[in-house]
Design a protein with these regions (language model features):
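Alpha-helical transmembrane segments of multi-pass membrane proteins predominantly involved
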Residues: 1-469
Length: 469
């Protein structure tokens, strides 16, 4: 039985071992280079990812509080792959940083919480995992200790996270008071329609998730947090953290509140519309590229919610597929932005005018990533949004798809505006040729292959759909 526990929890165990190993390395030897710390982290993350595709255990432990199956393993593999890419991208930034080991420890701690959160089948484990995945993020947001805006970002992240966690905890308390259980399965079997307290509990939990994924109207400090955080942390917040919460959101909606499907359909549709429109409108007027990507990510959440509104296996598969595509696309863009900011300090959109003149490889990588985020064929972002809209149309809300299509056209303007700056516009102060270290180069190549390959490989969506069923 003990061996079975280890196999079922191999992701969590490897991440925990990596954290403990980094702590020992940090305490025991100050002479170990940051590059060695990065190599240890990346090596063990890669080992966890490989084992995640080789070992395919299914079962429950801890009194059915922790559940593992093929779908949960896929979600964890996606998050680990994204974290590995971010770790590779951050190596240049952390090369001479005094506290590099602490960065990786915090990064892995929040990843550990996300893995537990995905396997949670009990609200107590879910909440504890949520806090484990959230608290280290505040420290990461404040990692540039010498910058005032980094401290401001951390403070705003703490306040918004505390508020959202409080809403969730209050909702969970009401559920426990009316059902007598915190188990997902037992709550789903006990919950009833037209029970005001249970409906209120659902609204509170939904609002808590809304804060975590930056859906409108719960998005207010998102851009400030993204702008003030280091680029590596911003990319982690926008992709990995948001992806993990969306994975759990699928489980809670479909497994716990399936009885309320008719009610949460309209709620999700309304929130998705506001999220798309407001995210797009604010993205149009941004000059800082990190704030731009913040509102871009808010708009993308609107599309994800449209796909989720279908409430079927197709919906779940389309959301997971889009998150895979979004990880490659967003991290590809952030990889270039991190390099530019780290070496030049520039983060204004106009700073990218004439970028292609001296940095052809980086320009193509950023251009492909932006094409994917815009949903332009044949890159993967087009197919990701196509599957989301197809799922959203399952209930016949073609007007919703029409509004989403209009928003896609609007988003083309601000994505292609950056592409125009890179490839067409000229500047007397264009960015000089930037050196690319081997690890960030590997990360960027992985992202480009992922963006192109996941779009051309039709079997990926089918693979995800089979696991969902």
């Amino acid at each position: 039985m003990q061996t079975n526990y280890f196999i079922l929890m191999h992701h969590e165990l490897i991440i925990t071992i990596t954290i403990m190993l980094l702590l020992v390395i940090k305490v025991g030897s100050d002479k170990l280079s940051n590059q060695m710390v990065a190599n240890v982290t990346n090596g063990l993350l890669l080992a966890s990812l490989v084992l995640g595709f080789i070992l395919k255990p299914e079962g429950n432990v801890f009194g059915d509080m922790f559940h593992t199956d093929g779908f949960a393993l896929l979600q964890k593999n996606i998050l680990i792959a994204g974290t590995l890419i971010i770790s590779l991208q951050a190596s240049t930034w952390l090369k001479d940083y005094e506290h590099a080991a602490e960065f990786y420890i915090l990064l892995l701690s929040t990843l550990l919480g996300m893995c537990f959160m995905i396997s949670s089948r009990h609200f107590l484990m879910f909440y504890l995992s949520l806090e484990l995945s959230t608290i280290p993020l505040a420290a990461l947001a404040n990692f540039d200790l010498h910058l005032k805006r980094s401290s401001e970002a951390a403070l705003k992240l703490i306040i918004s996270s505390a508020f959202s966690s409080g809403l969730m905890l209050l909702g969970i308390s009401f559920l426990y008071g009316t059902t007598g259980s915190l188990s997902f399965a037992e709550v789903a079997n006990t919950i009833q329609l037209n029970t005001p307290l249970q409906l209120f509990a659902f609204v509170l939990i939904f609002a808590g998730f809304g804060f975590k994924i930056s859906a409108v109207p719960f998005h207010l400090w998102t851009a400030d947090v993204y702008e003030g955080s280091p680029v590596a942390v911003t990319s982690y917040l926008s992709v990995i953290s948001k992806g993990a919460v969306l994975f759990v959101f699928i489980t809670v909606l479909f497994n716990v509140f399936a009885l309320y499907a008719h009610s949460w359909y309209y709620l999700i549709v309304i929130v998705s519309l506001f999220t798309m429109v407001i995210g797009n409108l604010f993205a149009l007027r941004q000059t800082n590229i990190k704030r731009f990507l913040a509102f871009s990510s808010i708009s993308q959440v609107g599309f994800i919610l449209i796909g989720l509104s279908g409430g079927t296996h197709t919906s779940a598969a389309s959301v997971v597929y889009f998150i895979v595509v979004y990880i490659f696309s967003n991290l590809g863009a952030f990889g270039v932005i991190a390099l530019v900011q780290g070496l030049t300090g520039k983060e204004n959109i106009n700073d990218y005018k004439g970028f292609y003149l001296n940095n052809k490889m980086l320009s193509w990588m950023l251009g492909i990533a932006l094409f994917s985020l815009a949903g332009i064929p044949p890159v993967a972002g087009f197919f990701g949004k196509f599957f989301l809209l197809l799922s959203g149309a399952e209930k016949g809300a073609y007007w919703l798809i029409a509004i989403a299509a209009i928003n896609m056209v609007v988003s083309l303007y601000y994505y292609l505006n950056i592409v125009k700056n890179i490839f067409i516009d000229k500047s007397d102060n264009s960015i000089e040729k930037l050196p690319i270290a081997i690890q960030p180069r590997i990360a960027m190549i992985i992202c480009v292959i992922g963006v192109v390959g996941s779009g051309l490989c039709g079997g990926l969506y089918q693979y995800i759909f089979d696991l969902v069923k």
